[in-house]
Amino acid sequence: FRLDQWREVKDLLAEYYTFDESLYYSILPTATQYARNSIFSGLMPLQIEKMFPELWVDEDSEEGKNLNEAPLIQTQIERFRKKYTFSYHKVHDSQYNDKLLNIVPSLLHNQLNVVVLNFVDMLSHARTENKMIRELAQSEAAYRSLTRSWFQHSGTLELFKRIAGKGYKVIVTTDHGTIRVDNPEKVIGDKNTNTNLRYKVGKNLNYNPKDVFDIRFPDKAGLPSPCLLYTSPSPRD
């Protein structure tokens, strides 16, 4: 979820909420498995790996990298010696959103409710992988418009409406954004190199060092060290 996307939907909530905005940077790499896990745990990825190895999934593992989000939230609550009652929900589709709307009264008894709206993340990936979505969101203005249309007509807006007026604080945030890259850089690696387009991890990577931000000592950046880790795109993009 990008800042410009937030600006696009903010006025839809203005009737129901007042706003207090703050800006912050995502960690690197700007990928869900690192950035979102860090937000929920309140820790850098390397700290998660060391303190809660059972909750950290290595880069080369075939296991889902974001299956431990609720336990990571629990670790942060316990680390700060709080006794919050909380719930965790990941909204993948409209059916789950409808289910969430039906249980809003019971959720209001919790001190913390965490809701992951996966559509925006799915949209950013589909913009790269799906030809139809590429056509619909071929410009930044079109991308923002698509986000607004979804928000305006989805059950998500209804969820915000039902919470409004109950005296609760709602925090709308994101783990990372997206950048449309017009000048991609080529990073060549062996068969063990990961396939993620946002960043590359590998022992033998060939690239132009002038165009790629590389991290040769991942621990210095708070990252686990399966091998050398490099991130892209380059600053000029």
Regions found by a protein language model. Give the residues of each.
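Metal-dependent active-site segment of extracytoplasmic phospho-/sulfohydrolases and closely related
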Residues: 1, 159-188
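Segments forming glycine/polar-rich beta-alpha architectures that bind adenosine-containing cofactors
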Residues: 1-28
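Flexible loop/turn segments at secondary-structure boundaries
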Residues: 2-5, 47, 121-125, 178-182
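Short secondary-structure boundary/capping segments
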Residues: 8-16, 128-135, 181-196
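His/Asp/Glu-rich, glycine-adjacent segments
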Residues: 28-142
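A long, amphipathic alpha-helix that forms part
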Residues: 131-170
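Acidic, His- and aromatic-enriched active-site or binding-groove loops in soluble protein domains
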Residues: 191-208
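Conserved small/polar residues in nucleotide/adenosyl-binding loops
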Residues: 230-237
